[in-house]
Amino acid sequence: MVDSNDDAFDGEKSKTQIKRELHALVELGERLTTLKADTLARLPLTDELRKALAEASKHTAHGARKRHMSFVGKLMRVQDLDAIHALLEQMDSSTRQYNERFHSLERWRDRLIDGNDEDLERFVNEYPDTDRQQLRSLVRHAQHEKARNKPPAAARKVFKYIRDLDELQRGLR
């Protein structure tokens, strides 16, 4: 008969669960090794872990790297993982937002160069601080370059102008 009063295992983690958690810590450590120094500086890490992450790039042999990453995983156990995950998620979402904004501005540039006056009017409605004459001039130069199969120097200027307007409108300048 099975004893239902096995209180010894209540609340304890299985060996498999512990291994999963340790593997997740090692994976998080691997991700931290890919971050730049200024990004790492923003994370709440102990000095010992910072040193271990800096040393991780020195280990190139598979076995040595695996051992060192296990050590990093061990050091990760005493870190504030919720804060680290929150900051990493915030960085990822800001990068995603930046990329989405960048692609949106690229689409505006392409529409203005390939488009007509309607696209220009839509752009001016969305960005009221636009110097219409300057934008028309930049777009016209970009269209001439495109027609002559020249390098897109004027298209870059159109993009820079659009980006500057966007930053001005969003209060980043």
UniProtKB/Swiss-Prot annotation:
Give the highest taxon in the source lineage.
Bacteria
One GO MF term, please?
Answer: ribosome binding
Entry annotated with the keyword RNA-binding: yes
- InterPro entries, per database record: DarP (IPR006839), DarP_sf (IPR023153)
Q: Which UniProt keywords apply?
A: Cytoplasm, Ribosome biogenesis, RNA-binding, rRNA-binding
GO cellular component labels: cytosol
The subcellular localization recorded is:
Cytoplasm
Entry annotated with the keyword Cytoplasm? yes
Q: What is this protein identified as?
A: Dual-action ribosomal maturation protein DarP
